[in-house]
Amino acid sequence: MLTLFGNKRPSKSAGKDEGPLVSLAKHNGSVEVSKPWSSSDEKLALTKAMDASKGKILLNIEGTSSFGTYESDSIIESEGYDLSARMIVDTNHHISNWKNDLFVGNGKQNANKVIKICPTWDSRKQYMMISRIVIWVCPTIPNPTGKLVVALIDPNMPSGKQVILKGQGTITDPICFVFYLNWSIPKMNNTPENCCQLHLMCSQEYKKGVSFGSVMYSWTKEFGDSPRADKDKCMVIPLNRAIRARSQAFIEACKLIIPKCNSEKQIKKQLKELSSNLERSVEEEEEGISDSVAQLSFDEI
């Protein structure tokens, strides 16, 4: 044993890195050194396993996050509503750019909006899976009071069965809807007439044809040769108006959904674009809406 280790005396720095030796064992003609298994070893092994998988995983594991301050009080969101932790993204998937749209008033009647999710088919695979859809709704008027419902729709079902997933909230403050699902679509169904849709309805009373809110949405898609068809859930995340672009948790959440926008300046510019399309015509808003519209209603809270 002295001959084996005589020329390999560890330095002081190496001893700190290796930690205390526990035992020596001979296995298959070689000598193995065992040492205690620490939490750092477990984290390192997990990181290596994630890096070795197909695609890379972006993960926020900091627990609770500070979203900013309002007057003298800190706003702390629990881990259950940590945006960064919720929005784990497999970078092997295709992430769409943010689409900007408007919510326009309809007088004293409910305002309705239809968004068609028809992604570009840029693969030779047989199926495209929509795995996450994120919708941000931000009021652009003072003191909004309207209730809001957002539903994921299959327009090919009978009108009474078109709602696949639904979430509800208010536009008193900015609000985010995150649809988690596994919905595989064959290429022949990826048309404006047959693709999945988002239907939004708001009870805010506002002058007909005038915008009272901005809608921003994005999705992830994944191509494959085998289909999957599972509905999961819709998560509703209300956001306090105290959130600012300089909030670290908010910046990290935006990084995960918008990989091309990594600096605070870019994210501020992205958020500023929430209200940049106020000159969109009502004719374009109403264009292409078919007669087969899902019947939405507000649930009692």
From Swiss-Prot:
What keywords would UniProt list here? Answer: Host cell junction, Host-virus interaction, Transport, Viral movement protein
| Matches recorded under InterPro entries | Bunya_NSM, MPV
Q: Where is this region: Essential for long-distance movement?
A: 284-288
Segment Essential for tubule formation and cell-to-cell movement: which positions? 19-159, 209-283
Q: Which residues form the signal peptide?
A: none
User: Where is this chain's protein located in or outside the cell?
Assistant: Host cell junction, Host plasmodesma
Q: Which GO terms describe its biological process?
A: transport of virus in host, cell to cell
Q: Where is this region: Disordered?
A: 1-22, 282-301
GO CC annotation terms, alphabetical: host cell plasmodesma
Q: How does it assemble?
A: Oligomerizes to form tubule structures through host plasmodesma. Interacts with host A.thaliana At4g26020 protein, which is involved in intra- and inter-cellular trafficking.
| Family affiliation | Belongs to the tospovirus movement protein family.
Reported function: Viral movemement protein which is responsible for cell-to cell spread of viral genome. Increases the size exclusion limit (SEL) of plasmodesmata by forming tubules structures, thereby allowing viral ribonucleocapsids to spread directly to neighboring cells.
Q: What is this protein called?
A: Movement protein
